[in-house]
Regions:
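A short beta-strand-turn-helix
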Residues: 3-20
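Thiol-based oxidoreductase modules, predominantly thioredoxin-like and allied folds used
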Residues: 4-6, 25, 37-60, 66
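Short loop/turn elements that flank and shape the SAM/SAH-binding pocket of Class I
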Residues: 11-13, 57-59, 91
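Short glycine/proline-enriched coil/turn segments at helix->beta-strand junctions
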Residues: 18-19, 44-48, 98-99
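Short pre-active-site segment immediately N-terminal to redox-active cysteine/selenocysteine motifs
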Residues: 19, 25-29, 68
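The canonical Cys-X-X-Cys-His
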Residues: 30-33, 72
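Structural alpha/beta surface segment adjacent to cysteine/selenocysteine redox centers
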Residues: 60-69, 73-75, 79-81
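Non-catalytic, surface beta->alpha helical segment in thiol-disulfide oxidoreductase systems
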Residues: 76-99
Length: 99
């Protein structure tokens, strides 16, 4: 299951981590975001996945240039390594961390 995080948790769990993780930038009102949810939950069985609500954490979304959602960003060592925008498949999500 994907863990919903806030701004403080983002700084410690994502930016402060040496591990690869995925962050799903979403909003509750976004239909494609809701459709991506089960895909991200499936990915979370094998990889670290966090969800960040862009309505609650506008500054972080702006900091990472999130203009459209859903937006999934892969991080490693606290830095962005890849991203995907829009409703995509599990295999497309996995490619973000395999490249």
């Amino acid at each position: 299951m994907s863990k919903i995080i806030n701004g403080e948790e983002f700084n410690s769990l994502v930016l402060g981590s040496n591990e690869v993780c995925l962050v799903d930038f979403y909003a509750d009102w976004c239909g494609p975001c809701r459709m991506l949810g089960p895909v991200m939950d499936e990915v979370s069985k094998e990889h670290t996945v966090y969800k960040l609500n862009v309505d609650d954490e506008e500054e972080i979304a702006r900091q990472f240039g999130v203009m459209s959602i859903p937006c999934v960003i892969a991080f490693k060592d606290g830095k962005e390594i890849n991203r995907s925008v829009g409703l995509v498949s599990k295999s497309d999500i996995l490619k973000l961390i395999e490249e």
